[in-house]
Regions:
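Residues within mature, well-folded domains
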Residues: 8-112
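C-terminal motif of bacterial Sec signal peptides marking the signal peptidase cleavage site
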Residues: 3-6
Length: 112
């Protein structure tokens, strides 16, 4: 008798995907095009887009930390964002993501 169990979304599956993505990220280079990143990394788990001051900022988020056995959902900390501006890779990582959004969305207050 052979039993087959699906593992999509399981801790084993997310762990394998995270490990693969981390290994692929070692080959990322600033200035790569979206198509080059897509060829290296595959499709992102999810994306975010922002239009700020005429700039098209896009973040591709890749799973880089697997889900624990008792975790039912994935958290932001499970993903590493890759930042693109006008289809060119600017940088990656959670700190880069948070700093880029904070800088780009900074409210400018005029002096009186």
């Amino acid at each position: 008798m052979i039993l087959l169990f699906g593992c999509a979304g399981s801790p084993v599956r997310t762990g394998w995907e995270a490990e693969t993505n981390r290994a692929n990220m070692l080959n990322l280079k600033i200035g790569m095009s979206k198509s080059q990143v897509l060829a290296l990394m595959g499709s992102p788990y999810k994306t975010e887009s922002y239009q700020i001051d005429g700039k098209n900022l896009e973040f591709w988020l890749y799973l880089t930390e697997g889900r624990g056995i008792y975790d039912r959902t994935l958290r932001d900390s499970n993903f590493t964002p890759l930042a693109f501006e006008n289809d060119v890779l600017l940088g990656w990582g959670r700190n880069y993501y948070e700093n880029k959004l904070r800088i780009e969305q900074d409210i400018k207050i005029e002096k009186r």
